[in-house]
């Protein structure tokens, strides 16, 4: 009997000690709780930058030569997205327009542009209107930007006029067949242009 009483008193003593500790350390009123801070807005994970295959879009690797850019576009167009193709084609069209402004032949340039406009406008009627608008702009650029030849260019033109007359006279005197005459004159004039101007179709003669 006595051991049971001893254990009971010991249990009551321990409970009293625990309750006292709780009352001592736990405040009578709860401390005010700060309102919940708005959780930071989740920022979408940054998508890895995919370098465009389009030349205008990736200037670090785009070739400087416009002809090379056109060739690269033709090779890679099938691998581009629709948006990339359109943006690249528009960029090339603008470059071709600028070429006319500095002396390129508007007709040849327009032929190149017509290969690009289907990537800009898929609808046939709208594309036709776009082609017409571009052609008129090219004609305006060509007429406004024509410049007088420099003294050096004038000398080249005079030399070409004199030498080409000699070439034609020599061929007419030595070749009887008309078709052969045309072919011979064409070949010799090409060689003469390359000799004088450095190229077979100099822009100076297209002004």
From Swiss-Prot:
Where is the signal peptide, in residue numbers? 1-21
A GO cellular-component term linked to this record: periplasmic space
- InterPro entries assigned: PLipase_C_acessory_PlcR
Alphabetically ordered keywords of this record: Cytoplasm, Periplasm, Signal
Q: Does the keyword Cytoplasm apply?
A: yes
Function according to Swiss-Prot or TrEMBL: May be involved in the regulation of synthesis of phospholipase C.
Q: Which organism is it from?
A: Pseudomonas aeruginosa (strain ATCC 15692 / DSM 22644 / CIP 104116 / JCM 14847 / LMG 12228 / 1C / PRS 101 / PAO1)
Name the gene behind this protein: plcR
State the superkingdom.
Answer: Bacteria
- The molecule here is called Phospholipase C accessory protein PlcR
Q: Which residue ranges does the record annotate as region Disordered?
A: 37-59
